Amino acid sequence: MGRTLTSVLVVFISMAGWLGGADTGSISGILGMRDFQSRFADRYNPITNSYSYSAWRQALLTGTVNAGCLFGAMLSSPFTEAIGKKYSIAFFSGCYIIGQILLVTAVPSWVQIMVGKLFTGLTIGALSVLSPGYQSEVAPPQIRGAVVSTYQLFQTCGTLIAACINMGTHKLRKTASWRTSFGINILWGIFLMVGVLFLPESPRYLIYKGRDEEALRIMCQTAELDPESEIIQTNFNTIKSDIEMEMAGGKARWPEVFGKEVRYRTVLGFLTMLLRELIGNNYYFYYATQVFKGTGMTDIFLPAVILGAINFGTTFGALYTIDNLGRRNPLIFGAAFQSICFFIYAAVGDRKLIYKNGTSDHRAGAVMIVFSCLFLFSYCCSWGPMGWVIVGETFPIRYRSKCAAVATSGNWLGNFMVSFFTPFISNSIGFKLGYIYACINMTSAFQIFLMAKETKGLTLEEVNELYESDIKPWDSYKYVRQIESRRIHFSKEEEKREREKSKGYRGQEERFIENADGADNDDSSASSESFASAGAHSRSVFPRRSNVSEESHPTWV
């Protein structure tokens, strides 16, 4: 039951990432569709009979959704505290459907497109807080990192599928080309909204609401252990005592998010999510067409499919690295490697891609594509999914919803900055923008080294203890090793006790059998007149169930 429940949990909750990826992947291709441009672009060239967007129009069409995500992330907190993560996810999934309907029914006014993107952004931002948070609270600690990473995996899958849909619909006549792409996104919203209703609520939220029995049952299902298990009882009592201790201080207020107790973690989460976007992942998707044109490729929809496939395929690597290599090392070394990729990308693009006569160097374009793919491989194995993991597991429960909202808002602020300002900066300095991204990546590596603590394999309560301690981030792996050693010792002791109980039971059973055999021998030598009394004596050898304690014979229930 536990593995089935965890699998279902992964699929349905990670669909929240799919919604965001599908929206991003669809708009990037829709902006290039002929019918959409004829209705919503603000520039027309009669000589070439082509449409284009001004920097302001393109920035508003692509950046508005991220502005909505920024506010949506903050909206998630009051909903979580009122109705829990499960029903909040269902509610915002419905809001996503409404936003996509606004896009499908847009009239020839770009303002409705912008409003639809803003409304959709509100829901994507809220779900980006709720979904990883739900997964972190329900998943067992041994696989929590991999479970939360599936949010990013589904996000990249949604982007890839949307790019493929655009490639298939852009040749449809008139509005069907872009309305179909927007309309299919409605199906993903329905899938998540209905599916999440069949999943359990977070055990920590249930304990917070006083529903202890239901919380205990869910913990047993996900861990595949009995309620009497010492591991389950220890975890349950730890969670309950921590919640009671934190709730004794009353409901957290917004100013407390930056109070002494959690200020460090709030800043860590916000900076990690902000830098997650500023290190340049989305830059490649916004300007992939220009780079691929340098290699001689003319199909404007194919680059998005190629990069989307790489983005999706390499994210599987994170499912291994995050719970085997930990959090710190992949983030630090990933950012350093990405800095090198961006530096080479910028140098080649600035000096070699476009000649003064307007022609392109195909070899330079190929080199840039290679380092774009290497960057995406590193990003998808490190910063892509691990930012969500840090947000999901770092904060104590009393502050969790508010701190996670503030931290996730950093993600959408960074995304908005990249999508809105990149057209203006790129028009001014071209591929030199890559040098800026290279510097940001190096800054990100130092930020993780100085601030983030290793939390691989720890329960959320152990993570809280780690951040409350004076252990330096670069020494935190020692704490993890101590916890792992203690856990292994505890597991061995429990196995030893079980073996001793089993051994004691087998010894009792052997004695019962010997006594029974002795009684049978007495019966065979007894006279027929004493047979009845001998038979009665043989039955009295076996103790009655009421006379055998549960402690001495634990398998009798």
From Swiss-Prot:
Native species: Schizosaccharomyces pombe (strain 972 / ATCC 24843)
- Record family assignment: Belongs to the major facilitator superfamily. Sugar transporter (TC 2.A.1.1) family.
State the UniProt keywords alphabetically. Answer: Glycoprotein, Membrane, Sugar transport, Transmembrane, Transmembrane helix, Transport
Q: List the record's Gene Ontology CC terms alphabetically.
A: plasma membrane; plasma membrane of cell tip
For bias type Low complexity, the affected ranges are: 524-536
Mind telling me which Pfam families this protein's record contains?
A: Sugar_tr
Origin: domain of life = Eukaryota
User: What would be an example GO MF term here?
Assistant: carbohydrate:proton symporter activity
Q: Where in the cell is it found?
A: Membrane
Q: How does it sit in the membrane?
A: Multi-pass membrane protein
- Chief subcellular location: membrane
Biased composition (Basic and acidic residues) is annotated at: 492-514, 547-557
Name the record gives this protein: High-affinity hexose transporter ght4
Mapped to this chain, the residue ranges on the Extracellular side of the membrane are 31-58, 109-112, 166-179, 286-301, 350-363, 426-432
Annotated region (Disordered) at 492-557
InterPro entries for the chain:
MFS_dom, MFS_sugar_transport-like, MFS_Sugar_Transporters, MFS_trans_sf, Sugar/inositol_transpt, Sugar_transporter_CS
- Segments passing through the bilayer: 10-30, 59-79, 88-108, 113-133, 145-165, 180-200, 267-285, 302-322, 329-349, 364-384, 405-425, 433-453
Q: Record's CDD domains?
A: MFS_HXT
Lineage, please? Eukaryota, Fungi, Dikarya, Ascomycota, Taphrinomycotina
**Cytoplasmic compartment spans:** 1-9, 80-87, 134-144, 201-266, 323-328, 385-404, 454-557
Q: Which residues are glycosylated?
A: 357
Instruction: Give the UniProt record's GO annotations in the biological process aspect.
Output: carbohydrate transport
